[in-house]
Amino acid sequence: MKFTVIIPARYASSRLPGKPLLDINGYPMIQYVWQKAQQAGANRVIIATDHPQIQTVAKAFGAEVCMTSDQHQSGTERLAEVVAKMAIADQEIIVNVQGDEPLIPPIIVQQVATNLDKNGVNMATLAVKLTTREELFNPNVVKTVINDKGMALYFSRAAVPFARDHFSECDDTFVASQCYLRHIGIYAYRAGFIKQYVAWQPTVLEQLESLEQLRALWYGEQIHVELAKQAPALGVDTAQDLARVRQMLSQTV
C-alpha cells in the first residue's frame, strides 16, 4: 500500500507565532514531524506551508515543499491546494499529519492509511481511550463517539457521551471504565475526497466546535475510527506544551 503524507505548516498562530519553526533541542519542530512521517514508510512526504521562511528551513533539511495560500481556514483546505497543484491522482491515499505533532509515533501514521484502505470509506482517523476526568472535561481534548462498526457518530470538545446518572461519581476510575475516546488529529483520505470536502460549504457544527471533520459528517460521509496502536503525546498548542516536548525529547537523545 502506497500513501503520501502532507504536513500543513501554517506560520500564523495566535498563541505560538511561527510555531513550525520553534526550536526543540537544536532543530525546528517541523523537522521532527517530517522525520516521523518518513519513518512511517510514506512513499512521499510533502510540507505544505504559506510562509517562505518555513519553505527555506524545510528545504534545507531535505523536505519536499509546496507553497500554499495564507487564506486557508483549515488544514484540509491547504491539502486540497497541494493535491491540485501537484496533480495527485484521485485514488491516492493522503495522510494529513499536523505540523505541531513532533512526538507522533510513525506506527500510527501508517495505521491510519491502512485503516482507510481496508474499510472502504473516504475518510479515516484514530482515537485512544480516555482515562482521566481532567481529559474528559478539557475542551482542548477532542472526544469522539462511534458506533459498533467503528464509524464516527460525532466529534466534540464537550464531555460526550454525557454520563447523566453518574456525573457526581465521574472520577478517573469511572472514565476509564466507559467508552470515552480521545480523538487523535490525524486523518487519511483519498485525494479525490479532499476535492469534494473543500467544495462543500462550511457548516454550523464545525464552526461552533471549531472541528473541521464535522463537515464530512454533516454532508453524510462516514469516518472510520480505529483505536491507535500507540497513544501519542498531545501536540504543541501552548508554551507549556513546548516546554514539555523539549524535556521529553531531551531525554531520548
From Swiss-Prot:
Record GO biological process: CMP-keto-3-deoxy-D-manno-octulosonic acid biosynthetic process; lipopolysaccharide biosynthetic process
Q: What is this protein called?
A: 3-deoxy-manno-octulosonate cytidylyltransferase
Keyword Metal-binding applies? no
What taxonomic classification does the UniProt entry list for its organism?
A: Bacteria, Pseudomonadati, Pseudomonadota, Gammaproteobacteria, Pasteurellales
By its UniProt entry, which PANTHER family does this protein fall under?
3-DEOXY-MANNO-OCTULOSONATE CYTIDYLYLTRANSFERASE (PTHR42866), 3-DEOXY-MANNO-OCTULOSONATE CYTIDYLYLTRANSFERASE, MITOCHONDRIAL (PTHR42866:SF2)
Family named by the database record: Belongs to the KdsB family.
Q: In which pathway does it act?
A: Nucleotide-sugar biosynthesis; CMP-3-deoxy-D-manno-octulosonate biosynthesis; CMP-3-deoxy-D-manno-octulosonate from 3-deoxy-D-manno-octulosonate and CTP: step 1/1; Bacterial outer membrane biogenesis; lipopolysaccharide biosynthesis
Question: Gene3D superfamilies under this entry?
Answer: Spore Coat Polysaccharide Biosynthesis Protein SpsA, Chain A (3.90.550.10)
The record, for HAMAP family, names: KdsB
The catalytic activity, as recorded, is:
3-deoxy-alpha-D-manno-oct-2-ulosonate + CTP = CMP-3-deoxy-beta-D-manno-octulosonate + diphosphate
Gene of this entry:
kdsB
Where is the protein found, in the record's own terms? Cytoplasm
Q: Indicate where this protein is primarily found.
A: cytoplasm
Alphabetical GO CC annotations of the entry are: cytosol
